[in-house]
């Protein structure tokens, strides 16, 4: 059948949006790859999506206001760039404030890496993140597990990385954390915790901060953020060996991004 000029134009118009979608997808994938290659989190775990393996625990220890959440968000964004789902559990911090952390860190990361901060790139990451909030006084690990189970079993959201931000380690947690360890292995999740320490507090018997010492055996990785003068040092307490060329890591006080002190 002979196509008229009008028919050919109409067919081309239908193909054009599809071609643009493909081109846009490739461009977004290229930007993601650039961010992964230039992400400062790779100093901790290489260019993999996470420092931990399935079923493992990691802790970021520091005093209040030093940068625990900022480092957590960098780890989460690295996982999201690899298209792996993240659940960020925040205690006593509303969804909009947690989301603001992600927007600010993503903006700093994009600018530092020289990658255009396009709205499409940001929007492509959001399906891989779920923010869950609790009031600290009503929170319990079993309650969190119940909500996570509902999400996973109904296939609403299946996380590979779980962040628990704001849980107090000043109270006994061994039994609850042991149960969560089993839960994370069952569902193939890696779990990161922020652990708040206190000024002028003696370390535990192992030399680790008191908040970690009673449950240290449950953690495969522990990182401490230590203010020294105007710098915030990133110190590995357990489970990681930094590359020789990146052995001195700090948090940039302006952007709160991990950076190589010697760079």
Positions of PLM-derived features:
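Pre-Walker A adenine-sensing motif
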Residues: 39-51
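Pre-Walker A (Motif I) flank of P-loop NTPase domains
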Residues: 53-58
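P-loop (Walker A) phosphate-binding loop of NTP-binding proteins
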Residues: 63
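Conserved lysine of the Walker
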Residues: 68
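Conserved P-loop
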Residues: 71-129
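Phosphate-binding/switch loop-helix module in NTP-utilizing enzymes
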Residues: 130-186
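Structural recognition of the conserved hydrophobic beta-strand(s) that form the central parallel beta-sheet
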Residues: 165, 190-199
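Phosphate-binding/switch region of NTP-binding enzymes
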Residues: 196-263
């Amino acid at each position: 059948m002979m196509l008229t000029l009008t028919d050919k134009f109409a067919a081309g118009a239908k193909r054009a949006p599809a071609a643009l979608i493909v081109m846009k997808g490739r461009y977004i994938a290229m930007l993601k790859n650039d961010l992964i290659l230039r992400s400062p989190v790779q100093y901790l775990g290489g260019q993999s999506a996470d420092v931990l393996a399935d079923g493992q625990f990691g802790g970021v220890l520091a005093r209040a206001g030093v940068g625990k959440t900022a480092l957590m968000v960098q780890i989460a964004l690295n996982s999201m760039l690899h298209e792996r789902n993240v659940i960020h559990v925040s205690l006593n911090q509303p969804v909009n404030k947690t989301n603001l952390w992600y927007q600010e860190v993503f903006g700093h990361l994009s600018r530092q890496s020289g990658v255009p901060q396009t709205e499409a790139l940001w929007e492509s990451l959001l399906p891989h993140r779920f923010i869950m909030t609790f009031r600290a006084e009503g929170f319990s690990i079993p309650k969190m597990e119940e909500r996570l189970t509902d999400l996973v079993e109904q296939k609403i959201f299946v996380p590979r990385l779980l962040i628990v931000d704001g849980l107090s380690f000043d109270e006994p947690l061994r039994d609850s954390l042991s149960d969560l360890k089993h839960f994370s292995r069952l569902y193939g999740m890696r779990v990161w915790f922020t652990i708040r320490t206190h000024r002028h507090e003696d370390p535990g018997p192992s030399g680790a901060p008191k908040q970690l010492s009673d449950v240290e055996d449950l953690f495969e990785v522990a990182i401490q953020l230590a203010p020294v003068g105007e710098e915030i040092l990133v110190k590995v307490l357990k489970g990681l060996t930094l590359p020789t060329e990146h052995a001195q890591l700090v948090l940039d006080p302006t952007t709160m991004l991990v950076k190589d002190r010697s760079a």
